[in-house]
């Protein structure tokens, strides 16, 4: 098949690698004008991979993919298939009609639930035990096209948003691997989306405020939020680490665990109250118990050593955070 990839970030790199591994004729690669992205390793650059493979590259702001000059450039490539992992905008009808087979996309949720452009952390944030990804056909809507296939990575206790992201992208690569022969043969499924299951959202749009810790939540929920938003401090992740406020400044919590502190020791303490320093961190009261924050930094010291913040908190027991 003649394939045009419109892609970005690690998911775009993995999709391009799989297309090449399967011997597809990648006739063009459309990448972001920001690629390679500041703060991301070279392994997440679609442009660098395309250049190494000597593929034709068109570098544009990806939200301009529907512009007439871009459409003309893609049309000249005469693609059978457009593969677009995580598009930045819905495709216009003119773009959708260019490839003879169609346009396909990865969406990081178990469609039909959680449509939208910022859903990568949706399943882990909700507390699900699996992080789903859907390969689907594109139409003019936002994640409303027929489903081709779905898969999931199990969320382990030690997973963070950073690690589950990578695990899920590998699942996505496997979905593409299985789909390519079906696409060549004209046998790829087009499963119409069912109504959204009761209790699950139609769409999910990440808000920066979601990163703020609610200390009235359970210890399990607080730790889950911390782990969902945890990532290497030098990595340009899609959101900040989980945070609370301390002395009118943001205090980022990068790692935490549930505490087995005796309930009698925290009786009378309010949620968010700093309890005491432990061997590996700071105990903090939650809605139903306590957690130990084991890696924290103050706002201006995100890239620095966490010990300064831990020591500062330890000297201010019983400070109330938030």
PLM feature spans:
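A conserved acidic, glycine/proline-rich C-terminal tail/linker
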Residues: 261-281
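One-carbon transfer enzymes
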Residues: 1-237, 249, 278-292, 297-322
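Short, structured protein-protein interaction patches enriched in aromatics and acidic/basic residues
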Residues: 237-255
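Low-complexity, polar-biased intrinsically disordered regions enriched in Pro/Ser/Thr/Gly
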Residues: 232-239, 263-269
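A short, sequence-level motif marking secondary-structure junctions
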Residues: 254-261, 295-301
